Amino acid sequence: LSCPNCNLHCMFSSEITSSDPLMNGVLSDMPDWEALGMVGGNLGFMEKEGKTPEEGQKLTQAERREALAKIQYTTFLHDNYSLDYIEGGNNLALVQELYQRKLITEADLDGIKPVWGDVHAIDALLKKIILREGVGDHLANGTLETAKYFAQKKNNPEILKYAGVTHGYGQPAHGVRSHADGSDLEYLT
């Protein structure tokens, strides 16, 4: 199956094969375009764990397979718990960016250290969001509200500039300027 006019045909199930027991054996759909961008590259899964995207180190073939397993697992969590990839990916990336820039700390995140590419940190944050537990109660409100929460908590309005939103909604992975999409005005109004 594929989306209308899309040649990727990414809607099929696959079992995750990983050296990480958290992900190994999970059966899920393969990530679609939005998932690849928003809960894949946006979260640093295609980089060496803990490195920033700017440091860009090449991955080995085995590391690429693990990166894809992380993307598929994070997609599974979003699918399984009816979460939106676009808002979820933007929100989690915001938290990672704020942490990287030392604008928030592990203490602000109930002890979670959200370094780029760490699927265990993403798993822990998503579970807190799903249960609205601890900091997850604030993160569950979306990217803009997460930025507002940390800006107020840290008394730092500069935090708001890191929220990748337009009119309060997270920016998608697809190009919203495409006339084939038919939704370009939806992002502006």
State the predicted function of each range.
Residues L1-T189:
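Extended C-terminal regions of large enzymes
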